[in-house]
């Protein structure tokens, strides 16, 4: 599916979702990984640094259950160790559509409740660039899948969540030259961390 078509489908879905009478809430969430396990094809000896935020429209299906349709922006950077002769640096950006559900029916007090969120993330578009001492490459076509879930605590409109997420993203025709051989570049990450959210 072409990138432009993916963007159009995402825009139509979010517009229709947001204009429904039920969709009276939106949520923004920032994710802060605490523990990560990353394997980046083509950068096996380097550490991937990531950041991400999520904006979602919420559709109540019952008093304590909500469906969510949202947008996730993912950004990552990676760099070869100084001992590497290739000297590659990589920048990756991805725009993902999020489909999920949340439950917040476990009330601890009048204003505090436990919640649980789960979602899948489908890449819609992305850009990536790798630069080395001898060559460089760019890509604007992305594929893969992501998963997210975790328990948390909601206090009024604020929430704190302990999350687990897994992400597998590949960029078409993005390669690096290692020991005279071309290697495809792809991101595989598992993260545990803290999420801060606000519903408005």
Task: Spell out what each predicted region is.
Residues 1-25:
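Cleavable N-terminal export/targeting peptides
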Residues 22-77, 197-199:
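Short glycine/proline- and aromatic-enriched beta-strand/turn motifs that initiate or cap beta-hairpins
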Residues 26-32, 67-71, 99-101, 116-118, ...:
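Membrane-embedded beta-strand positions of outer-membrane beta-barrel proteins
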Residues 30-38, 71-77, 103-105, 120-126, ...:
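Transmembrane beta-strands of outer-membrane beta-barrel pores
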Residues 34-47, 72-94, 124-143, 170-187:
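Flexible, solvent-exposed loop segments that connect beta-strands
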Residues 48-54, 94-98, 142-148, 189-193:
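Transmembrane beta-barrel architecture of outer-membrane proteins
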Residues 60-64, 106-112, 155-160:
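Outer-membrane beta-barrel channels and translocator barrels
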Residues 80, 147-200:
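Predominantly the C-terminal beta-signal and adjacent terminal strand-loop region
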């Amino acid at each position: 599916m072409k990138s432009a078509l993916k963007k159009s489908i995402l825009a139509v879905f979010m517009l229709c979702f947001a204009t429904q009478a039920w969709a009276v809430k939106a949520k923004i969430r920032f994710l802060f990984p605490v523990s990560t396990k990353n394997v980046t094809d083509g950068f096996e000896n380097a550490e991937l640094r990531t950041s991400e935020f999520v904006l979602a429209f919420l559709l109540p299906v019952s008093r304590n259950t909500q469906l969510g349709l949202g947008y996730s922006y993912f950004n990552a950077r990676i760099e070869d160790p100084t001992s590497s002769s290739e000297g590659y640096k990589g920048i990756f950006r991805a725009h993902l559509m999020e489909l999920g559900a949340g439950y917040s029916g476990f009330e601890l007090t009048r204003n505090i409740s436990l919640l649980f969120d789960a979602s899948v993330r489908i890449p819609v578009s992305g850009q990536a660039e790798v630069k080395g001492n001898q060559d460089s490459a760019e890509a604007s076509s992305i594929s893969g899948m992501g998963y997210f879930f975790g328990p948390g605590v909601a206090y009024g409109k604020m929430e704190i969540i302990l999350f687990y997420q897994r992400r597998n993203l590949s960029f078409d025709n993005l390669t690096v030259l290692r020991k005279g051989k071309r290697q495809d570049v792809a991101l595989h990450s598992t993260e545990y961390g803290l999420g801060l959210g606000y519903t408005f």
